């Protein structure tokens, strides 16, 4: 599986490290706070994504590790930029 993370705070950072340490394929991170995504990508040996859409395309499982108050906004962004994206990419979403 290819795991991607939208959000690179404590939860995304830690979960990505756990997966990477257990030989799982962490493809990378996207965050509105670039520095956090860059740091998380370095820490997990993965990639920093400047573009959320590219991370979606490269992932099979997408962890949404953003604050609860941001989920609706994030969902609307994903829907508007990726028509039929769940079927096209066979993608699973998980919010933690």
Question: Which stretches of residues belong to each language-model region?
Answer:
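NAD(P)+-binding Rossmann beta1-loop-alpha1 motif at the extreme N-terminus of oxidoreductases
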Residues: 1-50, 54-56
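Short active-site oxyanion
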Residues: 24-28, 59-62, 87-89
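Hydrophobic/aromatic beta-strand patches that form the interior of the parallel beta-sheet core
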Residues: 30, 49, 63, 91-92
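Rossmann-like NAD(P)-binding element
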Residues: 53-79
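Short, conserved loop/helix-junction motifs that constitute active-site signature segments
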Residues: 80-86
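Conserved small/polar residues in nucleotide/adenosyl-binding loops
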Residues: 94-96
């Amino acid at each position: 599986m290819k795991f991607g993370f939208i959000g690179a705070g404590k939860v995304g950072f830690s979960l990505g490290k756990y997966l990477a340490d257990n030989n799982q394929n962490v493809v990378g991170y996207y965050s509105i706070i670039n520095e956090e995504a860059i740091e998380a990508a370095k820490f997990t040996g993965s990639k920093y994504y400047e573009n959320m859409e590219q991370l979606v395309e490269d992932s099979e499982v997408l962890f949404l590790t953003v604050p609860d108050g941001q989920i609706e906004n994030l969902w609307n962004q994903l829907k508007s930029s990726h028509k039929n994206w769940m079927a096209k990419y066979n993608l699973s979403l998980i919010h933690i």
